[in-house]
Amino acid sequence: MAILDRSFTAPEAARFLQEQAPIHPLDTVNWNSFAHRPDVSFRIGHSDDRILLCFYVSGDRPRARITEVNGPVHRDSCVEFFFSPLADGVYYNFEFNCVGVPHCAYGRGRGDRTLLDPALVDTIMRSSSLGSAPLDESASVSSWDLAVCIP
């Protein structure tokens, strides 16, 4: 796994991952109710204190209407990262819409999750190729990428 050993911004982390980390295609969509399945891949690495992720999405007409932290970003074009640091069944769910608005929770299952404090969520560095402003579905854009650095 790629290791970044200095301080950085989210765009710098994305460049580092592009140079140092292999790309992994995602071909599993867990939500059958969503028929649209864009091409998605990602790169992952870490620093001493952050998980570094870069998602690449194509074949999508991105939409980002949700603007509040821990809002229902699943209604927008979004990506997810699940992380379980211990073998106790508790996991973290990090969801981001295409402009980087996060929804972050932890717990043992989908119906038993607690939202992370918005002040803590705001420490996640994010950088989207689409910027950070809300957007409606756009026919002129068919791909986007998102870099996140999770403390």
Predicted regions: what is each one?
Residues M1-P151:
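Structural preference for beta-rich elements and adjacent junctions enriched in aromatics
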